[in-house]
Amino acid sequence: MTISDSPQTPENLSLPKQGFRQLIKIVADLRLAIVLLLAIALFSISGTVIEQGETISFYQQNYPEDPALFGFLTWKVILILGLNHVYTTWWFLSLLVLFGTSLTTCTFTRQFPALKAARKWNFYQKARQFEKLALSTELAINDLKFVNNLLEQKGYKTFQENQAIYARKGIIGKIGPIVVHAAMLIILGGAIWGALTGFLAQAMVPTGSEFKVNNIIEAGPLSQPQIPKDWGIRVNRFWIDYTPDGTIDQFYSDLSVINNDGEELKHKTIYVNEPLRYHGVTFYQTDWGIAGVQAQVNNSPIFQLPMALLNTNGNGRIWGTWIPTKPDLSEGVSLLAKDLQGTMMVYDQKGDLYSAVRPGMILDINGVRLKIYQLIGSTGLQIKADPGIPFVYTGFGLLMMGVIMSYVSHSQIWVLQEDEHCYIGGKTNRSQVTFERELLGIIESLEPEKT
């Protein structure tokens, strides 16, 4: 007989089962769940601190190798570990799945059995059983019906078997932890679903322009159905409100959702913290810029030139353009603007400041009449779709409800009638003082029955 032909003993057959039980025990361990939760929180914080979805040059500039931030955090480390898109990395999603598995295992191996035990009728049949209760007494009464009615008046659900009564209330407190676990699983599922199916895009759009979502910064592997293809956005107008001292108070974008035929489907003026939502896609007002300037040289048609954001080495934002003053482009002037309030600076061919102008003013320079009509603003939009958000909100609501439910005390009272003696005792899992007062009140209500 070969080894493979040897009969399997019961001990050998039970080894896989024992290993599975040991694995379940490890996965359901509260300590593992706490470690996973702390890891998720830590990496979530890193995703908040470290800018997400930026270009490689951005990380090279802000996280150089020398000196490294905290001695180790460089742009290479960020890119290798995926810290530039934490929430969609395989290891972060794996942490969420593992934490969800731990919660599920704990729910079925601990919470459901605890609820089942709490729902079970557990009668005391011997007087000595009351000795293990911290709160118990003996009364000389023989009217169990009166005791039963009194407990029901106090909100207890009572069960009677022969000369024994079992009463309980607050079973919802045992359901609370299960609701909490279910809520956390819904939140985790929503986060994973959002990472797989959501996308993040950006757009800088001049006033009067139309666009479709195409500048995708981040996208999940299942996000294509979320990206709008049969509708787009038209920027009707963009403007900025300034305070009396010249600082920005708020900037606004008047947007229209349009279909492929140009028909308006929805209209809304958005500003910071007041986005436009349409078919699961949200448009946030996040930035602004100067897209161009309209000008006229002598009697030429009004033309529009683009304005570019200049490098000021961190000394504020300035946009500039070059306006030709001769048909052969041999001469021209530079026009600079720092905001949409209207004041622009004109520099001649040598780079010297020539004049300051405002929209509608006419300037004589290089032998021509230059008229500036207006600056064209552009709105900076962040576009986001996250189908997991409804699940996260639902889970958060259930989580709050489950936490409140968990604070309800699960109280139990046992009564046993033996001859002329009535034994009564009880216990609770929280609010011990309140329960003691309630039980003493019940006992005091029963004491007059001694006579």
Curated annotation (Swiss-Prot):
| Top-rank taxon, per record | Bacteria
Q: List the disulfide bonds.
A: none
Which one GO biological process term can you cite for this protein?
cytochrome complex assembly
**Where is the protein situated, by its record's location annotation?**
Cellular thylakoid membrane
Give the coiled coil ranges.
none
Q: Which Pfam families match?
A: ResB
> GO CC: one term?
plasma membrane-derived thylakoid membrane
The membrane topology of this protein is:
Multi-pass membrane protein
TM region(s), chain numbering: 30-50, 89-109, 175-195
Q: Which UniProt keywords apply?
A: Cytochrome c-type biogenesis, Membrane, Thylakoid, Transmembrane, Transmembrane helix
In its keyword annotation, does this UniProt entry include Membrane?
Answer: yes
Q: Which family does it belong to?
A: Belongs to the Ccs1/CcsB family.
Quaternary structure and partners: May interact with CcsA.
The record's function comment reads: Required during biogenesis of c-type cytochromes (cytochrome c6 and cytochrome f) at the step of heme attachment.
The protein depicted here goes by the name Cytochrome c biogenesis protein CcsB
Annotated organism of origin: Crocosphaera subtropica (strain ATCC 51142 / BH68) (Cyanothece sp. (strain ATCC 51142))
